[in-house]
Amino acid sequence: MLDKIDRKLLALLQQDCTLSLQALAEAVNLTTTPCWKRLKRLEDDGILIGKVALLDPEKIGLGLTAFVLIKTQHHSSEWYCRFVTVVTEMPEVLGFWRMAGEYDYLMRVQVADMKRYDEFYKRLVNSVPGLSDVTSSFAMEQIKYTTSLPIE
C-alpha cells in the first residue's frame, strides 16, 4: 500500500522525473538512502514503469490526432492475438483499448496529416480481416492533455 511519502514522491516524479535524489529526499523530509529505497521499491513493485521525455507532436511534424473506434465480428483468441500483434507493431498507435459498449476497440493514433492517416488506415484494414466498422474522429484542438495520474 502507498503511504503519504510514496504518494508525494510519485506526484513529484510525474511533474519532473529529472529531479535529483537529493531534491526528492528534501521534498519528502527524508535522507537520500531511505528515499532511494522507496523509489527502488516503487520500481520493483511495478508502480514506476518508466522515465520518458514528452514531445510536442506538432513541433515534430505529427500534428493530426485520430481516435479510431472499431467493431468486429471476430472474437476468437487466434483472431484477437493476430489483431493485437498487428496493432501493437504500428508506431502511430499511441493507445489501444478493448472496450465494453457499442464498439469493441479504441485507438489513439498520431500522424503527420490526412494522407498519412489514410496510409495508416489502409495498412490496418488490409492487415486484419474481419473489421466490420472502422470509424475515425479527428481532434480539432487539444484542450487538456496530461500523463499525470491523480494521486491523493
Swiss-Prot record:
Disruption phenotype: Slightly increased sensitivity to excess L-cysteine, the effect is more pronounced in M9 minimal medium. Loss of expression of dlsT(yhaO)-yhaM operon. Cells no longer produce hydrogen sulfide in the presence of excess cysteine. The keyword Transcription applies. One of its GO terms (cellular component) is cytosol. GO terms for molecular function: sequence-specific DNA binding. GO terms for biological process: cysteine catabolic process; positive regulation of DNA-templated transcription initiation; response to amino acid. InterPro entries: ArsR-like_HTH, AsnC-type_HTH_dom, Dimeric_a/b-barrel, Tscrpt_reg_AsnC-like, Tscrpt_reg_AsnC/Lrp_C, Tscrpt_reg_HTH_AsnC-type_CS, WH-like_DNA-bd_sf, WH_DNA-bd_sf. PROSITE patterns: HTH_ASNC_1, HTH_ASNC_2. Pfam families: AsnC_trans_reg, HTH_24. Keywords: Activator, DNA-binding, Transcription, Transcription regulation. Residues 2-63 form the HTH asnC-type domain. Residues 21-40 bind DNA. It comes from the Bacteria. The keyword DNA repair does not apply. Plays a role in L-cysteine detoxification. Binds to the dlsT(yhaO)-yhaM operon promoter in the presence but not absence of L-cysteine; activates transcription from the dlsT(yhaO)-yhaM operon. No other DNA target was identified in strain K12 / BW25113. Thiosulfate does not activate its transcription function. Overexpression doubles hydrogen sulfide production in the presence of cysteine. This is DNA-binding transcriptional activator DecR. The gene is decR.
